Amino acid sequence: MRNFIVTGTDTEVGKTYVSCLIVKSLREAGINAAGFKPVACGDRQDARLLREAGPKDLTLDELNPVFLRNATCPYVAARLENTKVDEKVILRAYDALSAAHECVVVEGVGLSLIHI
C-alpha cells in the first residue's frame, strides 16, 4: 500500500473528514494505517480526529509535528510567532509514521499551493 495526501482548495472543505474516513476504512480492512497532519494552525482538532480514526497510541506531536498557535496560514503564523516551519521536522515525523504503518494518509493545509 502506498501513502497518499488529501488536499483541498480551501479551509473547511472536508479534508479532515475524508482523511479520517480513509484511515478508519483502511484499518477496518485490516491495513495498518495512520493519519498525518504535518502542519496545523490555531488548534490541533484535526490531529485529534485523525488519532481517533487511527492508532490511539500515537501522540499529537507524532501526528502533527508542527503546531502554530495563530489561526492563519502557516507562513504568516510562523512569522507572527517569530519562528520558521522546519521541513526536516516534518520529514522525520513522516518517515517514522511510514516505517511503522502500511499506509499514511497525509492531510494537507487549507490551500493546495499554500506557502509554508
PLM region spans:
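Extreme N-terminal starter segment of soluble prokaryotic enzymes
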Residues: M1-F4
